[in-house]
């Protein structure tokens, strides 16, 4: 079954907008099982709830916009819609077949998908890397083609140098891009990342942490697990508020209490002489 349908401007509107067919393009209805996803598209994670919402809409209203595929029936644009149709158990869907070879299809699919606003940082970064390595794009050419700043593209490309564990934390929003940029090409990036998470450091604190890492404030553990421990470097001056706090706490608990105030956190220590004093501390804490 073949029919004409005028829905828009075609692939000339590829960058930054939804791709719609022009008057001369032919919309075909084909079996959904013949269509293949594009393994090189940057988006790797599809939220089930959003796909389900789209599937429900398709069940109620039909698929209003055709999927664009190449001669091999590989998706160029529209994988979310294809997945939603599969979920909705739609058997046949409208498509537009573009006369692209494999290389052209791959490039167009990458460019189109990178323009999406809902890609994760690392999905976008990997898409940039693939275009640079396989299609001879430069940072300048990518910036011009995608309408993004050169600094944005250069910064994201550098994220590909991070260890996989940190890339995963970026994708899961455990670390921000600001945190991750501080760790690029650092010998102890993974250990510092764990420290950032465990101590809930902001980006400015992370920058300070990275600057101080090799200045005897941090050291390897004596065991062989390559864990990095934080050495507490005390501030030269303990302000009056902390001194008053130490005195007040010592008086309240009737024991010696000290505070080690470090540049990135600190320690509050209760000193007891025997188990009876420990029991007394615990009872007052309760």
From Swiss-Prot:
The lineage of its organism: Bacteria, Pseudomonadati, Pseudomonadota, Alphaproteobacteria, Rickettsiales. This is Probable chromosome-partitioning protein ParB. Gene3D superfamilies: 1.10.10.2830, 3.90.1530.30. Involved in chromosome partition. Localize to both poles of the predivisional cell following completion of DNA replication. Binds to the DNA origin of replication. NCBIfam families: parB_part (TIGR00180). Belongs to the ParB family. The gene is parB. One of its GO terms (biological process) is chromosome segregation. Signal peptide: none annotated. The keyword NAD does not apply. Pfam families: HTH_ParB, ParB_dimer, ParBc. It comes from the Bacteria. GO terms for cellular component: chromosome. Keywords: Chromosome partition, DNA-binding. One of its GO terms (molecular function) is DNA binding.
């Amino acid at each position: 079954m073949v029919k004409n349908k005028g829905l828009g401007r075609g692939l000339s509107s590829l960058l930054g907008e939804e791709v719609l067919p022009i008057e001369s393009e032919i919309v075909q209805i084909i079996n959904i099982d013949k269509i293949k996803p594009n393994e090189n598209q940057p988006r790797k994670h599809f939220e089930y709830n959003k796909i389900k919402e789209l599937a429900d809409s398709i069940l109620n209203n039909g698929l209003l916009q055709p999927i664009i595929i190449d001669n091999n029936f590989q998706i160029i644009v529209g994988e979310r819609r294809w997945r939603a149709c599969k979920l909705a158990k739609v058997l046949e869907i409208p498509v537009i077949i573009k006369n692209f070879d494999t290389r052209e299809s791959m490039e167009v699919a990458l460019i189109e998908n990178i323009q999406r606003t809902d890609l994760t940082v690392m999905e976008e970064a990997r898409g940039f890397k693939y275009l640079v390595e396989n299609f001879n794009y430069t940072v300048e050419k990518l910036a011009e083609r995608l309408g993004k700043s050169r600094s944005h593209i250069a910064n994201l490309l550098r994220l590909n140098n991070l260890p996989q564990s940190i890339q995963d934390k970026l994708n899961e929003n455990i670390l921000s891009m600001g945190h991750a940029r501080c760790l690029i090409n650092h010998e102890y990036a993974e250990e510092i990342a764990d420290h950032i998470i465990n101590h809930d450091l902001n980006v400015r604190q992370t920058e300070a942490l990275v600057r101080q890492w090799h200045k005897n404030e941090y050291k390897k553990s004596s065991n062989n697990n390559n864990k990095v421990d934080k050495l507490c470097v005390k501030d030269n001056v303990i302000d009056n508020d902390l001194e008053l706090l130490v005195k007040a706490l010592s008086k309240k608990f009737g024991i010696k209490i000290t505070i080690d105030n470090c540049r990135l956190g600190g320690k509050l220590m209760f000193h007891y002489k025997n188990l009876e004093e420990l029991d007394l501390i615990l009872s007052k804490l309760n």
